[in-house]
């Protein structure tokens, strides 16, 4: 069966055909690091981790780029507010602190490190190059009020609105800079001229004066830098469809780039039946979530619904996940104990059942895939009851394969070693970062550097295993 994904732009399921045979380029909008990460950030990271794992299992080499928006209005505003109350933390330090929180939470959930994780501030020249092209093509203009702002001219691009199937006339004005300098209220900022109350460190030189990039141009530039002018999948939360992704598509296409071939969006998170929001005071931080249960249960809970659905987090969510995981772990414990010393030990083929593959190929239907997983656990237990060790071994192999694909295998070294100590969590973060650096080296065929990282980890007692589902590590016994 061919993998099918719901493409937001097409408004329909489409067969997934990579631009290059055997390879997938995927860009995912990462966090804007103006505050601590919350449950919505983790849900999004987990969704694209599941997609990446399935593509990898299917034999595709995935290049995943997930950006970090480390400069924008909110980052600067939050840093300024903290300084007004007597703090001394600079905006870039605040952004880095929250970036580290997001990374640590992602590692705790078993989210594999992106191939590339660029910060917006490291791609300023690439952003300016796209802006210059847009000006030359007549799709952008510098504000005439001396502010240093540069805007995208929405009226110059008739296709504007194609992602969300809206007409420009039906859209409201963008509220991202002084509207008096715009030709049209719906025009959006590509470059924001420096303001008097903003720090020197947040201003970058440009042909239009010192300033900083608008939010939308950041992702267009970073995706192009790491994946090229055309790539396979652009992902992000449902709340980013408009205006962020609509603006990304318009400015990249107007600059002459084909951009993303598939647009994939994950659903949002409700808390106790209500939309999560600051005004309701019901936001659940990553720290709160990971403190409420072991990370494996959090991963199972957030990843058990269909990625496009809105999930509802409530008091019983994590206990339901724990119960499901106990059934899986209980089967592994029982079958391994019974098969020990028999000719069936290790005989089960670690291949997912056809029904599981069909579910995952059907727009990543994880709920149906989990149903297959739990049915296989039940049949495996029934085989043990009947002393059918061959069938039990086969079921074990299938359960192992399915839980590996979903990242919820309780036998995985990560989950066996997920403890409550800060030292263990710090070790996991450090090892994952080194593995990320190793993957980057391999991407550019710098095998000397990649081997050196592996040797350093081995010397520290860390075993590295490269598998079809990704790189796994464990501490040598």
From Swiss-Prot:
Monomer. Keywords: Aminoacyl-tRNA synthetase, ATP-binding, Cytoplasm, Ligase, Metal-binding, Nucleotide-binding, Protein biosynthesis, Zinc. It holds the Pfam family DALR_2. PANTHER family: CYSTEINE--TRNA LIGASE, CYSTEINYL-TRNA SYNTHETASE. It comes from the Bacteria. It is found in: Cytoplasm. The keyword Translocase does not apply. One of its GO terms (molecular function) is cysteine-tRNA ligase activity. A motif ('HIGH' region) lies at residues 31-41. One of its GO terms (cellular component) is cytosol. Its cofactor is Zn(2+). It catalyses: tRNA(Cys) + L-cysteine + ATP = L-cysteinyl-tRNA(Cys) + AMP + diphosphate. Binds 1 zinc ion per subunit. Zn(2+) binds at residues 29, 219, 244, 248. Its EC number is 6.1.1.16. The keyword Amino-acid biosynthesis does not apply. SUPFAM superfamilies: Anticodon-binding domain of a subclass of class I aminoacyl-tRNA synthetases, Nucleotidylyl transferase. GO terms for biological process: cysteinyl-tRNA aminoacylation. This is Cysteine--tRNA ligase. Belongs to the class-I aminoacyl-tRNA synthetase family. A motif ('KMSKS' region) lies at residues 275-279. InterPro entries: Cys-tRNA-ligase (IPR015803), Cys-tRNA-synt_Ia_DALR (IPR015273), Cys-tRNA/MSH_ligase (IPR024909), CysS_C (IPR056411), Rossmann-like_a/b/a_fold (IPR014729), tRNA-synt_1_cat_dom (IPR032678), tRNAsynth_Ia_anticodon-bd (IPR009080). Its main location: cytoplasm. It comes from Leifsonia xyli subsp. xyli (strain CTCB07). ATP binds at residue 278.
């Amino acid at each position: 069966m061919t993998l099918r994904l719901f493409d937001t732009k097409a408004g329909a399921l489409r067969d997934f055909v990579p631009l290059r045979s055997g390879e997938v380029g995927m860009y995912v909008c990462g966090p804007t690091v103006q505050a601590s990460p919350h449950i919505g950030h983790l849900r999004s990271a987990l969704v694209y981790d599941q997609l990446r794992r399935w593509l990898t299992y299917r034999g595709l080499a995935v290049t995943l780029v997930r950006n970090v928006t480390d400069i924008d209005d909110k980052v600067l505003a939050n840093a300024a507010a903290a300084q007004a109350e007597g703090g001394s933390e600079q905006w870039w330090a605040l952004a880095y602190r929250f970036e580290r929180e997001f990374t640590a939470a992602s590692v705790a959930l078993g989210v594999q490190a992106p191939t590339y994780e660029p910060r917006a501030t490291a791609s300023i020249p690439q952003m300016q190059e796209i802006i210059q092209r847009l000006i030359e093509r007549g799709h952008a203009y510098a504000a005439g009020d001396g502010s240093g702002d540069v805007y995208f001219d929405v009226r110059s691009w008739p296709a504007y609105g194609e992602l969300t199937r809206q007409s420009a006339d039906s859209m409201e004005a963008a509220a991202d800079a002084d509207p008096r300098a715009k030709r049209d209220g719906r025009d959006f900022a590509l470059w924001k001229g420096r303001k008097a109350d903003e720090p020197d460190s947040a201003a970058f030189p440009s042909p239009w004066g010192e300033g900083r990039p608008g939010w939308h141009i950041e992702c267009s530039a970073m995706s192009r830098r790491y994946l090229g002018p055309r790539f396979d999948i652009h992902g992000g939360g449902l709340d980013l469809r408009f205006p962020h992704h609509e603006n990304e598509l318009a400015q990249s296409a107007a600059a002459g780039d084909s951009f993303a071939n598939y647009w994939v969006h994950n659903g949002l998170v409700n808390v106790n039946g209500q939309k999560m929001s600051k005004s309701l005071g019901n936001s659940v931080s990553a720290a709160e979530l990971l403190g409420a249960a072991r990370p494996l249960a959090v991963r199972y809970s957030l990843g058990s619904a269909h990625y496009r659905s809105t999930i509802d987090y409530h008091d019983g969510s994590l206990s339901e996940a724990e119960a499901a995981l106990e059934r899986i772990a209980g089967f592994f414990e029982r079958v391994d104990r019974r098969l020990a010393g028999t000719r069936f030990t290790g005989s089960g083929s670690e291949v997912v059942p056809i029904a599981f593959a069909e579910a995952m190929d059907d727009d990543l239907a994880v709920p149906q895939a989990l149903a297959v997983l739990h049915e296989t656990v039940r049949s495996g237990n029934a085989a043990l009851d009947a002393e059918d060790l061959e069938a039990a071994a086969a079921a074990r192999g299938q359960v192992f394969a399915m839980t590996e694909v979903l990242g919820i295998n309780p036998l995985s070294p990560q989950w066996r070693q997920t403890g409550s100590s800060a030292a263990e969590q710090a070790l996991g973060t450090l090892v994952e970062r080194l593995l990320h650096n190793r993957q980057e080296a391999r991407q550019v065929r710098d095998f000397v550097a990649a081997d050196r990282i592996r040797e350093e980890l081995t010397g520290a007692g860390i075993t590295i295993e490269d598998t079809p589902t990704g790189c796994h590590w464990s501490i040598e016994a």
